[in-house]
């Protein structure tokens, strides 16, 4: 020891933990320590030396600065047990397990905490559990932490049998609450509910940590009543308990109960809310679309002595973005001192979803460290605007691409009608050895369905089977749609019947497929199956049903379904439903009923409604209604040739040639041209598009021969 006078009131000892100031401080094979560390070692006094050195070792280790931590440790002439443990932990935190073992072996004296620290280090670094258990067995005097640490290792590795065995071997005085809580939490995380309940019920002492874990567990099991019963029986609750119960209500769909409990938590005031509680509240307000409550809680935050940290800011901004209040979202973003990729992406995603693409792109260009999410969001944004070239440009600029970005690009082509390009990009994706996911297959199956390309669809189906995702519901629904649109309802129904739990989309797709392929009776039969399943039909279901009634001419049944929409299912019929009914009545010759139905529509009839009436009026030679329908169509679609052509044809049929010429002259004077009909045919795996009267195709003779064969087959049906 070196004594140094400090004042005339006394002396203190300076701990001799460093070498001479003018010498180079080196640590075995390490670089010389920094001047900052040298200064620290020289100014440490005897009363605080070991404690401060231990703290500095831990601090440097957390920051990844092992060199400084080692320097302090090696230059300490006196070390406590905590010093050795701090150095073991420092190496373990930075993945240097061989060095940790070296320090452990060098320890002059090993106590229980030394063994516990080494076992903890091994578990954190996922070392051999067998060796960890051997070390555990070598502990002369095990304590509660020893047992809990080893049980933690078994639980994290999913070795619950060994965890249970060790728990049973744990002395009763060491079980509660540390070891019990470790096993309880492990079972809850693994979803082993019955085992968790057994451990909890077997605990002699149930303190706040174990009870809070069990409240959370009951909520995850869906046993909200049990969770609340335990919550109410607790004599002590912490913020974790309150937050778990509130979140449990929200996840079970009980917003009012969760919000009410939050208010009670605030009123009682014994436990203060924290960032996690508020994040749960903001998420619930977002998911339940409760802007008013969310903004009220935001107001509370500004009055709370609570740090507006990154986590809280992101939660609040996500709520505003998802609810569409972009002004508030931008305001929160503006006041956030720190921002991460979640912050930037949350605002960009919100702007994209609200079609504010220019503003989203401006923010995207400012974003530091753009990631997959931000790139993909912008591709989706420009896809929604129909700017496919910009999507391709962004895709090319991406430093890295994964299956999500490839899928976004393929979906962009599909949603904008570029089906062949979508398939081309899908094959490029496969060539790049990027593995498609279920969303990729749903998109490309949609493309093949739109092209009615059964051969390509079959190949994609085969790849789906090979990749073992044929049981994915979205893929199954896409396969049903593809086969239906390719005219193969038999295979479509085979896929449908293999769906273990079909949803309303599954039923709608199959019913619609039967309907537009002319199998109206099968569509109606499938609807009966839907009703028996207990699932609720929606507007799309009834559109397919009414279309089926049109194909089979079931007027009375069509009326029944149409009226039941409102009376039985509280679904308000839309313009498309009215158009189907007008078509059904018109084809059956009930044109006055069709006209009366249009006059009772609660919404403005669209072109589909008037088009159905015009077509039926021509068929049944009702000039008065045809003229009315044509007039309305011209008002809605002034550039469409359809009303002029159909009305002129009707005049020609009934011998009103002057009116026929008059209508066609009006059409010519307005320079309205009828778009030629377009068709496509697949020959030898290649799609050939052509217009009516088009003779520019190289395979004209082969196309003509194929069309004749199709016509002959149709005549045999």
Curated annotation (Swiss-Prot):
Any single biological process term in GO: RNA modification
Highest taxon of the lineage: Eukaryota
One function term, GO molecular function aspect: RNA binding
Localisation per UniProt entry: Mitochondrion
KW RNA-binding (keyword) present: no
Region described as Type E motif: 609-684
The PPR repeat ranges on this chain: 49-79, 80-110, 111-142, 143-173, 176-206, 207-241, 242-272, 274-308, 309-339, 340-374, 375-401, 402-436, 437-471, 472-502, 503-537, 538-568, 574-604
Key words, A-Z: Mitochondrion, Repeat, Transit peptide
GO CC annotations on file: mitochondrion
InterPro entries: E_motif (IPR046848), Pentatricopeptide_rpt (IPR002885), PPR_At4g14850-like_plant (IPR046960), TPR-like_helical_dom_sf (IPR011990)
Region annotation Type E(+) motif: where it falls in the sequence: 685-715
Cross-referenced NCBIfam families: PPR
Family assignment from sequence similarity: Belongs to the PPR family. PCMP-E subfamily.
Protein name per Swiss-Prot or TrEMBL: Pentatricopeptide repeat-containing protein At1g53600, mitochondrial
Naturally occurring in which organism (per UniProt): Arabidopsis thaliana
Gene: PCMP-E63
């Amino acid at each position: 020891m070196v004594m140094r006078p400090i004042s005339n009131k006394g002396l203190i000892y300076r701990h001799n933990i460093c070498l001479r100031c003018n010498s180079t401080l080196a640590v075995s094979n390490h670089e010389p320590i920094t001047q900052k560390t040298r200064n620290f070692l020289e100014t440490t006094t005897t009363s605080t030396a070991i404690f401060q050195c231990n703290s500095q070792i831990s601090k440097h280790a957390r920051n990844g600065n092992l060199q400084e931590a080692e320097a302090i440790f090696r230059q300490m002439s006196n070390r406590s047990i905590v010093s050795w443990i701090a150095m073991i932990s420092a190496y373990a935190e930075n993945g240097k397990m061989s060095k940790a073992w070296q320090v452990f072996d060098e320890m002059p004296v090993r106590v229980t905490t030394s063994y516990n620290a080494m076992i903890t280090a091994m578990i954190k670094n996922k070392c051999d559990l067998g060796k960890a258990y051997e070390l555990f067995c070598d502990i002369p005097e095990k304590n509660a932490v020893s047992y809990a640490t080893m049980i933690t290792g078994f639980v994290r590795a999913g070795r619950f049998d060994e965890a249970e065995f060790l728990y049973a071997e744990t002395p009763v005085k060491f079980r509660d609450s540390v070891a019990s809580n470790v096993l309880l939490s492990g079972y809850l995380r693994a979803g082993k509910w019955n085992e968790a309940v057994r451990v909890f019920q077997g605990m002699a002492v149930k303190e706040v940590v174990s009870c809070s874990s069990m409240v959370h567990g009951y909520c995850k099991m869906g046993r909200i009543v049990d969770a609340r019963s335990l919550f109410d029986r607790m004599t002590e609750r912490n913020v974790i308990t309150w937050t778990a119960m509130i979140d449990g209500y929200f996840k079970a769909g009980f917003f009012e109960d969760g919000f009410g409990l939050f208010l009670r938590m605030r009123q009682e005031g014994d436990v203060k809310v924290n960032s996690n509680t508020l994040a749960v509240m903001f998420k619930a307000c977002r998911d339940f679309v409760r802007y008013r409550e969310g903004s009220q809680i935001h107001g509370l935050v500004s009055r709370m002595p609570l740090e507006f940290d990154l986590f809280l800011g992101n939660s609040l901004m996500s709520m505003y973005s998802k609810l569409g209040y972009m002004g508030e979202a931008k305001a929160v973003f503006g006041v956030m001192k720190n921002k991460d990729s979640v912050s930037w992406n949350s605002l960009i995603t919100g702007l994209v979803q609200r079609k504010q693409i220019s503003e989203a792109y401006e923010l995207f260009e400012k974003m530091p460290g753009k990631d997959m999410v931000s790139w993909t969001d912008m591709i989706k944004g420009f896809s929604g605007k129909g700017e496919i070239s910009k999507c391709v440009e962004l895709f090319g600029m991406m430093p890295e691409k994964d299956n999500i970005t490839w899928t976004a690009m393929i979906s962009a082509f599909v949603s904008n009608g570029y089906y062949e390009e979508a398939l081309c990009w899908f094959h490029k994706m496969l060539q790049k050895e990027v593995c498609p996911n279920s969303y990729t297959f749903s998109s490309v199956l949609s493309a093949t369905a739109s092209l009615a390309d059964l051969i390509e669809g079959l190949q994609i189906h085969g790849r789906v089977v090979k990749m073992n995702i044929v049981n994915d519901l979205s893929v199954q629904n896409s396969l049903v749609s593809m086969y239906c649109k390719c005219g193969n309802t038999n295979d479509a129904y085979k896929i449908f019947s293999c769906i273990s739990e079909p949803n309303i989309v599954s039923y709608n797709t199959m019913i619609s497929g039967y309907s537009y392929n002319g199998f109206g009776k099968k569509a109606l039969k499938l609807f009966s199956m839907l009703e028996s399943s207990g699932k609720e039909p929606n507007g799309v279901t009834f559109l397919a049903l009414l279309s089926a009634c049109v194909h089979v001419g079931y007027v009375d049944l069509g009326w029944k379904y149409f009226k039941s929409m409102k009376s039985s299912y509280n679904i308000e019929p839309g313009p498309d439903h009215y158009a189907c009914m007008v078509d059904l009545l018109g084809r059956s010759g009930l044109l006055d009923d069709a006209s009366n139905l249009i006059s009772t529509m609660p919404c403005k009839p669209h072109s589909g409604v008037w088009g159905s009436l015009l077509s039926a009026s021509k068929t049944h030679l009702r000039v008065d209604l045809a003229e009315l329908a044509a007039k309305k169509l011209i008002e809605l679609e002034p550039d469409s040739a359809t009303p002029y052509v159909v009305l002129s044809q009707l005049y020609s049929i009934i011998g009103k040639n002057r009116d026929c010429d008059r209508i066609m002259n009006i059409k010519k004077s307005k320079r309205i041209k009828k778009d030629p009909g377009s068709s496509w045919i697949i020959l030898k795996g290649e799609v050939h598009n052509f217009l009516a009267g088009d003779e520019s195709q190289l395979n004209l003779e082969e196309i003509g021969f194929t069309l004749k064969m199709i016509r002959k087959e149709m005549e045999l049906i």
